[in-house]
Amino acid sequence: MSQQHEATAAAAEKPLNNGYLQANAPLEELSATVVSPLLGQQQVQHQAPHQMQQQQQQQQQNKLPTVVFLAPDGSGGVGIQRGNPAQGNPGMVTGTGSHSDWLLKESQQRRRLLVLAIAFTVLGAAIGALAIYFASVHQRCHLYRLEPDNDDRPNGRWNQDSGSAHEGQDNICMTQECVRTAASLLSAMDLNSDPCEDFFQYACGTWNKMHPIPEDRSSISTFEVLSDQQQVILRAVLEEPIDERDNKATIKAKTFFKSCMDIPQIRKIGTGRLKQVLQSLGGWPVIERNWSPPADLSVERLMGQLRLNYSEPVMIELYVGADDKNSSVNILQMDQLQYALPSRDYYLKESSANDRRAYHRYMTQVALLLGADPATAAAELEKVVLFETQLVNVSLPEADRHDTSLVYRKMLLPELQELVPEVQWQEYLQAALGPGIPLQEDEPLVTYGLHYLTEMGKILAHTDRRVVHNYMLWRLVMSLMSHMIDEYQRERVEFRKILMGIQSERTRWSQCVEWTNKKLGVAVGALFIRDNFNQESKEVALEMIHTIRAAFNELLAENDWMDDETRAVAKEKADSMNERIGYPELLTNATELEQEYVNLTIVPDNFINNVLSILQWESEKMLRLLRQPVDKEKWTTEPAVVNAFYNPNKNDIVFPAGILQPLFYSQHFPKSLNYGGIGVVIGHEITHGFDDKGRQFDKEGNMMQWWNNATIEAFRERTQCVIDQYSRYKINEVDMFMDGRMTQGENIADNGGLKQAFRAYKKWETLHGREQQLPGLNMTHDQLFFLNYAQIWCGSMRPEDALTKIRSAVHSPGFVRVLGPLSNSRDFASAYKCPLGSTMNPAEKCSVW
């Protein structure tokens, strides 16, 4: 999910400040930790008002302003810095041999006094700023009806309406964790906005101002900041010297990362290995002076070799996976092509002509770098773009492919040969599987793009072989370009400037961390969990899953559009969901972990060879599943990612270790924040089992119609309400509206997850009582639940990224994920006392689950 900022080695060595204390950190009832690049970490004790006033007067007399800012690591911690943060730390004056000892000591003493003076000034300013800020918050909260009614006051001890800071003060949490959490929430908010008109601006307005989009990415969000923080951790564990705790798997991960970082060695190797690969595949015609089609390499054989040896599915998406109608059996599956550009609209819409020109230029410049003739390369590759556009044109738009049952088609190999006679399917599939997996004469297979395959065959039959060969090898070259450096990287950046709006490439270390985690994720996960995963998180998450699933079942029993029989089967499916939390157990078993990578060779001094080895290893590992039963207990995602998943074929919900952290979860958070964070994520994944796709699969993971027709029609009516609602959200960056069809499954899950998590939280509150309030916020925990949910989606995007999201993303942009579910929530409207008819409390709401 992200591209990363530069981080220092020192930052990698320290525990991250995520806005809460580590589990073993000492707690002080009335103190707060302030982190400043100038002074390091300081303990700030609460002081008497006259002391605060004196320090504020001293600050006003000083010429340099005091700046309150978010910690530069994006953690949400609050720092205080004197002067202009961009100027950096002042240099230290050191003594020379010409000074006497007493002068040196006096100089050192003066410096100490100066540092102490600055420290006291900064700490006083911090307290003064917080006092003023909290007073402002108190006033704003009353202005926008954040105060609860009398009936909401816990035991009548806290009289919010009076504004008293003394009555019921034991109900205010003043631990370091609570102060930090409150400061983190406040630092993101725009208190000048009305929460009943634009809750995204209210919750995230200041965060978005404080986090401009970096040059090396097309968007910024809290998700990406969390991923940035996690990448710093992963960098640290990958850079650790190999020691006795390592096994063959973790050594391979560290070795791959090291080879990726070895730029001098990569330069030394150059492009020789890439050119060898192209030559072994018949040569790339555009860079060959006298190219002719190899007699022993048909189009079908070349497609198969690209799939088997380089994980490159050209023209056809081919893979082995669970049969949707028999989820215990692996089967060959084929689908329409993967696009080189983000979506089919980039090839077909007139408004994307500039993107197509940039794509053609990128293709041409790379070919020139590899030795193509400048006089002919552009014209030759223009034919490639036209050929690719023809293929894209006969593919179906993703919005028309949401109903899996309509695109699923199971058949035997001879039937496919009869339907698409232009392709020699036996030759292609055997080349893709390799000699170790003999293809059966009546091999069963599933297609999800039969219309595309039929039309593709016709296009192939009428296209010159040179054009086809040029296209196929270009797709391999394009995939490998992200791993190239220097002039190849510069051409890629120029292309991405047009396509994505980015202005520079990411730092090398962040690229290497991402590739290592994606390619060797299980081994990286084993390194990550050693010191960066709290087992208590797993237990708490499991407890929350049970309470949120119970809330789903309650809501299921209350809905009035489902018949009793279907409702009973739906409950069975929800109760049968398997939970996978944190990481698979094999991460702690060195023997099993080593077996995972037993057929993979990684060398310390040849990065491009390592990349090619991994591509072949990945492909062979996946294709070997063909004759094997489906292992429904096996994890299919790496543990160190900030995400969560639902798999319809396994009916399981997965919450990797990477997402069990703030803002989603912390053992120090109030329950309202945890339920508004990871709780909504849990509800979201549960609801995926019943969205427009998930509802087509039973509790065993098999696609079948287990709803009656009346219930299906009622579901579609409610789904259409969601589609229509989200299609009315306008993306101002490009002056276009959302396509509610593309994102319907995720929108249904967002709305259902929010409702379930809030109900589960209220049940927890009934059983355990109300928690202490957070200081300075003057907000109820119901309000904090929705605030934390909203702040998960803080962020902004470039126009280029906005266009890509509209055209191809299955998730709505962050602001829509806030406004949509909250405006459908009666619980939210009640918590914030939004008048009926206000923007965030419309009279007509959409509800599916």
UniProtKB/Swiss-Prot annotation:
Q: Which CDD domains match?
A: M13
- By its UniProt entry, which InterPro entries does this protein fall under? MetalloPept_cat_dom_sf, Peptidase_M13, Peptidase_M13_C, Peptidase_M13_dom_2, Peptidase_M13_N
| Extent of Basic and acidic residues compositional bias | 146-155
Q: Kindly list the cysteine pairs connected by disulfide bridges.
A: 173-178, 196-834, 204-794, 260-512, 721-846
Gene transcribed to yield this protein: Nep1
Segments on the Extracellular side according to the record's topology features: 135-849
Organism expressing this protein natively: Drosophila melanogaster (Fruit fly)
- UniProt family annotation: Belongs to the peptidase M13 family.
**What does this protein do, in the record's words?**
Metalloendoprotease which functions in fertility and memory formation. Required in the dorsal paired medial neurons and alpha/beta mushroom body neurons for the proper formation of long-term and middle-term memories. Required in males to maximise egg-laying in female mates and is also required in females for their fertility.
Per the UniProt entry, what is one GO biological process?
Answer: proteolysis
Quick check: keyword Cell membrane in the entry? Answer: yes
Tell me the compartments it is located in: Cell membrane
Q: Which reaction does it catalyse?
A: Preferential cleavage of polypeptides between hydrophobic residues, particularly with Phe or Tyr at P1'
Q: What is the predominant subcellular site recorded for this chain? A: membrane
Protein name (database record): Neprilysin-1
> In what way does this protein cross or attach to the membrane?
Single-pass type II membrane protein
Source organism, top-level taxon: Eukaryota
